[in-house]
Amino acid sequence: MTIYVDADACPVKDEIIRVGERHQTEMLFVCDGGLRRPNSQWARLVIVEGKLDAADDWIADHIGAGDVFVTADIPLADRCIKAGAIGIDPRGKLWTQDNIGASLATRNLMTDLRETGAVTSGAKPFGPKDRSSFLDGMERVMRAAAAKKA
């Protein structure tokens, strides 16, 4: 099992490292640059260059069944689920086969509404409650991935 992190704008990198170390699990922080190497023997920084979604493409090409992913990117979450991985977003929302379709539809609707100017606000600020929800959810994801592997 490996934890894949869509790291460019991830606000919970430190929490991922804590959980990954506790479970002694390899963590790959994938980005397009600008991040420092995570301070953990279990973590590796993967820098991909090129087109806009190069980090997403790298994760989708390397992730597999039983792996874990952390991303707020709904299309990437969909690709990872289709590969058999288990995931969570930085606010603690579990990505599942049951909710990814509705999440994609909502994302597409909101994109259309923003383009027409009907919606101008974005996501609410990330706070301590989100961080706590992520830690709880990440532990559940790790247990589910370990059970799937066994």
UniProtKB/Swiss-Prot annotation:
It comes from the Bacteria. InterPro entries: UPF0178. Coiled coil: none annotated. Belongs to the UPF0178 family. This is UPF0178 protein Mmar10_1466.
